[in-house]
Amino acid sequence: TASLGPMSRPLKPSERQSFINRFGYEPTMVTVAIDAIGVFVQESNPLQSLSVDQLDRLFSATRYCTFGQPINYWHELLDDSEYSLSDFAKFPEFPVQLFGRNSASGTYSYFKQKALCHGDYRNTVKQLSSSASIIHTVANRMGGIGYASLGSTIPGVKALSIANGGKEVEVNAKTVQSGQYPLARQLYLLVNQSPDKSLAPGVAQFLRYILSQQGQYIVRQLGYFPISSNQQQAQLNNLFQTSG
C-alpha cells in the first residue's frame, strides 16, 4: 500500500469514504504547492485576454455560466483591428480549435467546475492525455486554444489574462498566491497515516523537505507556485503534533 499519493483536487466524498472503509481512519491531505490553469494560444496570436463567460461559450456545450451563443470562429473573439492584422484575416471563417484534458484528469474536472459552471464540454474539444501535449499542440496550431497546467509552459505559447468580474487578471505569482487569478488550485499529497502511529521515517523526511524553503524552491523551479511560510508551518504542525 502506498504511503503518499499526489492529487490536483480534493478527494471526492465517495473517495474519502472508500478510504475510511478500507483503512478505518481519515486520509490526511497535505497542501504542498499551488498550480494555475492557464488558457494558452500561440505566442503570435493577438488575443490577450478572455473572460470567464467567453471560456464558457468556447468550451461548454451547455453554457450554464452565460446561456450565451457558442463561440466558433476567431473573428468572434478579436476586435476588428486585431483581426485585420492577424493571420486569421487571410481566411473568411477561421475556426477556433479547442484542446483540453481527458476525463480522468483533475484538471478536466477543475476547469469544468470553474470555467463551465459544472456544465458539459463540447464534443469539439479534443481531449489529450497531458498538459504538456496540449501546450505542444497549441504551439503548432495557429487556431488552437487549450487549457493546461501553467507548469507545462514552453516557448511559442502564451497564457491569456482572465477577466473576472470585469477586471483582467494576469497569471503570475502575485495573482495566484493572493487568489485573484480565478483558475488557481492547490496541489496535495494524500498521506496514508494511522492517527495512532508515527509517520514512517522516509515519509516524514520527505514531507519535511517538501514543506521546507528548499522544497518550495523546487516547487517554483518546476513551474508551480509555493505556499506561504504560514501554510508550510501549519501543515508541519498538523503532521507532526503527534508524530515523530
Segments from the language model and where they lie:
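Flexible loop/hinge segments at secondary-structure junctions
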Residues: 1-244
